[in-house]
Swiss-Prot record:
Name of this protein: Ribonuclease pancreatic
SUPFAM superfamilies, sorted: RNase A-like
Active site annotation, chain numbering: 12, 119
Main location: secreted
Name of the gene this protein is made from: RNASE1
Enzyme class: lyase
Top-rank taxon, per record: Eukaryota
Function: Endonuclease that catalyzes the cleavage of RNA on the 3' side of pyrimidine nucleotides. Acts on single-stranded and double-stranded RNA.
Protein's organism: Balaenoptera acutorostrata
Disulfide bonds: 26-84, 40-95, 58-110, 65-72
Length: 124
């Protein structure tokens, strides 16, 4: 079974890669990373930084998660990310996404031992 840490990596990590100016990046990646099976995941963020740098966020600035839990952390520096948002007209099984590249601080929820990211909460 996929662990929460592995699920985070599958859904959110795309190290050393960037969409460049490929408008189909999200369509390809959401499918490749199995987020269009059974339904279209409406919103997802990919982080284009090393796994080490993203894991390190778990020891950075402690902030409140959207759901009120206290195990979220905000990155000290901005990171290169891509937001994928399902387009209004797309319907399962033909999931279609808009690709937006951003430089933002990421907020992740961490748990376990070792203490690692298990949920992407937000970007600011």
């Amino acid at each position: 079974r996929e662990s929460p840490a592995m699920k985070f990596q599958r859904q959110h990590m795309d190290s050393g890669n960037s969409p460049g100016n490929n408008p189909n990046y999200c369509n390809q990646m959401m499918m490749r990373r199995k987020m269009t099976q059974g339904r279209c995941k409406p919103v997802n963020t990919f982080v284009h930084e090393s796994l080490e740098d993203v894991k390190a966020v778990c020891s950075q600035k402690n902030v409140l998660c959207k759901n009120g839990r206290t195990n979220c952390y905000e990155s000290n520096s901005t990171m290169h990310i891509t937001d994928c948002r399902q387009t209004g007209s797309s319907k399962y099984p033909n999931c279609a996404y808009k690709t937006s590249q951003k430089e933002k601080h990421i907020i992740v929820a961490c748990e376990g031992n070792p203490y690692v990211p298990v949920h992407f909460d937000n970007s600011v």
